Amino acid sequence: EVSSVSIDAYHSSVITHKNCKISKLKKNGADLTFDYLAYALPYPLDSISRSGWGNKRSQRDAMQLVPFMEEFNQERFQVTNLEKGMYRLTIDNQFIDNLSSEKLANGVNLADYPNTPQYQQAAKIMYLNEERFEVEKRFREYLWTEYSFLKKEGLLFADDQKAIDKLKEYLPKDGFLRMSYDWYIKAMNPEIREVWSNYMKSLVETIYKINKPVTHKVRLVRVE
């Protein structure tokens, strides 16, 4: 669970809150505002098919098979005792959705909304980590090539023309090597590996700079 909050609009009070902090709760007529600081971020489900190893499906497609959202990715937001009508939900002045008082009374899962600021923050972290993974994979393919083919030839970390020539002998017979060969040709150069390592370090540092939840201004405004 990411967080859970339940607010009584009529009494302008927080009924329950879990793994979050609610402050500056104010009611102005039928409208409601408060500051919301969750102690965790929602898990951003990638809706883009990455096609790795022939895979054509996205993470979000998997939600049809497992109850991940219901059991793990819950950012519950409930407001009871609102005047009957439709309400515009904004977070940090960003429009999220128009919701009925009935739906708000039942509660909604904010983790289902990819347009919330907290979801967008989590998505940035996801993309940075995916980039880190892609660079790290180059090292794995380089080492796989070294230990799967060159070690038995007495050419472990030789990284020279003799090693290249030996790999070329294996290329017609091994499809995995054909997929990794271009990365080996690049990674055999220590200068390139150093650049990749520094890039990964920079990515990780950026992730840790932006991965802390921040306080958001939540507003419910009656629209009809």
Model-assigned labels for residue ranges:
Residues 1-224:
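Conserved catalytic region of serine esterases and O-acyltransferases that act on ester linkages
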